[in-house]
Amino acid sequence: MRNEVRGLALGMVLLASPALAQDALTGDPAAGEKVFRQCMACHAVGEGAANKVGPELNGIIGRTPGTLEGYTFSPAMIAFGDGHVWDAATLDEYLAAPRNVVKGTKMAYPGLRKDDMRADVIAYLAQFDDNGMAKGN
């Protein structure tokens, strides 16, 4: 009986995961650009973006955490990358409380507490390919 309940619970989580990821991408990219201004002290995105205190974020959606060439990630972020991909749901969780999700992350920012702000900034970041160009252009 326990295994059946566990299997049912796991199945429900797996079915909900794409929906969670989609919800995180329903944000407003224009509003996300404004939210991202508070991230710009450490991060850059767009054409010509370069690493700063934190890594540049072009093409972050779909990237394995801790793998951007040219940036020195914490051992904790590199370990987190084993088995994770930056998708909307993972970014949403991380941006809410970075140090709770990746204990030992170099990111000092405490997190974006508001769901809508996280959805907006994720929608904004999702617009950029690896070269900082708007996707689809």
Give residue spans per PLM region.
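C-terminal capping alpha-helices of c-type cytochrome domains
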Residues: 85-136
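Electrostatic cytochrome c docking/interface patches
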Residues: 19-36, 47-48, 136
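Gly/Gly-Pro-rich "capping" loops immediately C-terminal to redox-active cysteine motifs
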Residues: 29-33, 47-86, 106-111
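Positively charged n-region of N-terminal signal peptides that target proteins for export
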Residues: 1-6
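Residues at helix-coil transition
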Residues: 15, 44, 62, 96, ...
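Bacterial N-terminal signal peptides
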Residues: 7-17
